[in-house]
Amino acid sequence: MNVICYGDSNTFGYDPRSWLGDRYDPDSRWVDLLAVETGWTVRNMGQNGRKIPTFSPVLPPDTDLLILMLGTNDLLQGHSPEEAAAKLEHLLTQIPLNQNQILLIAPPPMTLGDWVPNQQIIDHSHLFAQSCQTLAQRLGIPFANAGSWNITLAYDGVHFTPQGHRAFAHRLLEVLAT
């Protein structure tokens, strides 16, 4: 099975303890853990700072599954949950795959921290997750809400800790097994 994981810094495996964009080691990143646990070919197309793009990513023709988790950076940069959901809907309708080949994951809600100075952003992340679920249902796309996975976030209130990556991988494997 050929899997593409498309997302932001939490997909990339960004280590917030680093100022230079370093990554956690492969034994800690959820994308790498997914590959090890399944034996699948899993490509990490995470990018630090990625917002929801206007156009579909270029996917290899042998892509069996696209795991997509985006929206955090849109909210951090002032977009409303509704604006982010509209951008996400546009993106999802551009992806040249069948609906059952896409897994949309709502990012875990942010917490107060160095990058999250107020409750409004946290509230927006909860509302965005609800919008993602509604959107997935409307488009017939499989959905998972990482907000229910108890993902540990770092001091910045945004990025997964190594424990958060392991928990994310564990819960994602459960979703993929169903």
Give the positions of each predicted feature.
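Acidic carboxylate-rich catalytic motifs and surrounding loops in phosphoryl-/glycosyl-chemistry enzymes
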Residues: 44-52, 143-148
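Serine-esterase "nucleophile elbow" of acetyl-processing enzymes
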Residues: 1-46, 56-62, 166
